[in-house]
């Protein structure tokens, strides 16, 4: 391991973290600096093939345009989600949304768990592509929660289901290298990933309450949190191990919500007045359906189109992905916003004004998203080899602790790329080779990678910026990341311990 090379490859990440967390600068300020530094490295230190300036421009130019195009797609999703929130505010329906949720439970802590964890799990299975945080964060803000806390909670809620993604893509496609090599089946990859994340969802309700309310938030709520964690844990285990990756996330989210509502109605929760949402008694302007209509439409249309369109149209999924997977999700959210506006009786003039106001708030995000994505693509590129250098150096140092390192490598990949799928595809072959040389189980090692990649989404700057933009918190990324890093550290250690136990003690011969 060449320590200088490692530090130089790591330096773009350091620039982002130190700028946002250390100097408390906005991502809008830090991201262009990180991009400039990464470009300098690509043209000089990591010009591995000794290309001329013109040749390097030719290699990097497609990566720059790819970053801009993918950034536009993310901004489009942010625009759709933020427009819905602004419509609810403009019409006053936001108060009726609070009242509707309060009818399920007037305990704000229960609302945090259902909307912050269970809804994102469902949405990840229904669509993925950043939709969970983009929908859950504005929803929590609509319920009256602090915006930065809402963002952190929504990102945390999506920290486990991202291993399965829309219809299991992250595990199915991400683990294809193991399947193609005859080392694992899709079912085995899904089962082992579920055995990691079942413990993640077990502890997340407790972390969320501490994040939102501090220690006082646990008063009278521990029985419910235990039920929510255990029921979600068991549901995820059963679906991932005995049903399949395709339905694990959506099924876990839906069943957990139903079980949670049943618990609240049949058993009840002791709610101190300070945690009670009084919105249930206010004078309504809209019915529950009308007030919630944009979100109701999304909950119906996202899974309906994701699973229904490929089922009835030949090559339907390929058609959906013509402009990239995320684009169809963008369109559905935009359509749901329009349908919601019609349901709420919003006239065209008002809708246009809301869209204009929303656009002025989210368009500057393109600079941030584009810059960070270009940094990610350059670091992933074979022309620089920066990401592979980081991963291989970590692997070379840890030796028999490689299973734990695989979790960290997965997280670092998702931190840079913004997707668990990208991280899995990037490092799967490296884990296969490492497992062979160490005489370890490649399935459990890849599961650690897969689980870590899902968790890495929690602290990814791209995801944080996008989620901040949905609730008008651009510039407050440091406040959000301080919250998410604490949660990330707890679950990362848990997953690293599980990786060692699964590989070396409990399942050394799983699938072999």
Question: What is the predicted function of each stretch?
Answer:
Residues 1-6, 24-30, 60-72, 187-195, ...:
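Interfacial loop-to-helix junctions that mark the boundaries of transmembrane helices
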Residues 8-17, 25-47, 75-81, 225, ...:
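Hydrophobic mid-bilayer segments of alpha-helices in multi-pass membrane transport proteins
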Residues 24, 163-277, 451-512:
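Juxtamembrane and boundary regions of transmembrane helices in multi-pass small-molecule transporters
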Residues 58-92, 114-121, 287-308, 321-385, ...:
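Core transmembrane alpha-helical segments of multi-pass membrane transporters/permeases
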Residues 69-74, 101-115, 143-149, 326-329, ...:
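Membrane-interfacial loop-to-helix junctions in multi-pass transporters
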Residues 107-138, 142, 366-382, 397-430:
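Hydrophobic alpha-helical transmembrane segments of multi-pass integral membrane proteins
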Residues 109-121, 147-163, 184-205, 400-415, ...:
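Alpha-helical transmembrane segments of multi-pass membrane proteins
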Residues 131-141, 154-155, 168-180, 208, ...:
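Re-entrant/interfacial helical elements at transmembrane boundaries that shape
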């Amino acid at each position: 391991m060449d320590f200088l090379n490692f530090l130089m490859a790591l330096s773009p990440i350091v620039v982002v973290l130190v700028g946002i967390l250390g100097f408390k600068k906005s991502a809008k300020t830090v991201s262009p600096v990180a991009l400039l530094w990464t470009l300098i490295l690509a043209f000089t230190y990591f010009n591995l093939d000794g290309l001329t300036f013109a040749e390097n421009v030719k290699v990097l130019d497609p990566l720059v345009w790819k970053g801009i195009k993918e950034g536009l797609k993310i901004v489009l999703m942010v625009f759709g989600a933020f427009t819905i929130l602004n419509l609810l505010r403009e019409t006053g329906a936001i108060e009726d949304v609070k009242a509707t949720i309060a009818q399920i439970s007037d305990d704000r802590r229960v609302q945090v768990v259902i909307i912050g964890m269970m809804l994102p799990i469902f949405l990840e299975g229904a669509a993925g592509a950043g939709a969970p945080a983009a929908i859950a964060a504005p929803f929590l803000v609509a319920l009256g929660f602090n915006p930065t806390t809402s963002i952190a909670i929504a990102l945390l809620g999506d920290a486990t289901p991202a291993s399965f993604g829309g219809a299991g893509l992250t595990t199915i496609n991400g683990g294809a290298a193991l399947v193609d090599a005859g080392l694992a089946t899709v079912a085995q990859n899904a089962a082992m990933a579920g055995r990691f994340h079942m413990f993640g969802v077990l502890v997340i309700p407790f972390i969320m309450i501490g994040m939102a309310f501090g220690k006082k938030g646990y008063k009278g709520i521990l029985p419910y949190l235990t039920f929510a964690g255990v029921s979600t844990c068991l549901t995820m285990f059963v679906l991932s191990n005995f049903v399949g990756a395709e339905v694990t996330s959506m099924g876990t989210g839906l069943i957990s919500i139903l079980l949670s509502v049943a618990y609240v109605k049949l058993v009840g929760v002791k709610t101190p007045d300070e945690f009670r949402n009084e919105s249930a008694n206010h004078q309504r302007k809209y019915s529950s359906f009308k007030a919630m209509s944009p979100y109701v439409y999304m909950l119906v249309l996202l899974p309906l189109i994701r699973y229904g369109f490929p089922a009835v149209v030949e090559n339907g999924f390929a058609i959906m992905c013509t402009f990239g997977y995320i684009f169809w999700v963008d369109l559905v959210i935009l359509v749901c916003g329009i349908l919601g506006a019609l349901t709420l009786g919003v006239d065209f003039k008002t809708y246009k004004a809301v869209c204009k106001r929303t656009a002025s708030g989210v368009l500057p995000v393109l600079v941030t998203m584009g810059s960070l994505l270009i940094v990610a693509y350059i670091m992933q590129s074979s022309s620089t080899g920066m990401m592979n250098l980081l991963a291989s150096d970590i692997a070379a140092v840890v030796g028999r602790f490689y299973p734990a390192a695989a979790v960290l490598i997965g997280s670092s990949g998702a931190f840079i790329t913004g997707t668990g799928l990208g991280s899995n595809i990037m490092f799967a072959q490296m884990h296969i080779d490492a497992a062979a040389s160490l005489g370890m189980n490649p399935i459990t090692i890849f599961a650690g990678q897969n689980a870590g990649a899902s968790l890495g989404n929690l602290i990814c700057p791209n995801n944080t910026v996008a989620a901040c933009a949905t609730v008008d918190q651009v510039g407050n990324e440091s406040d959000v990341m301080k919250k998410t890093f604490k949660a990330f550290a707890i679950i990362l250690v848990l997953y690293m311990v599980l990786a060692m136990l699964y590989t070396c003690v409990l399942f050394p011969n799983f699938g072999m």
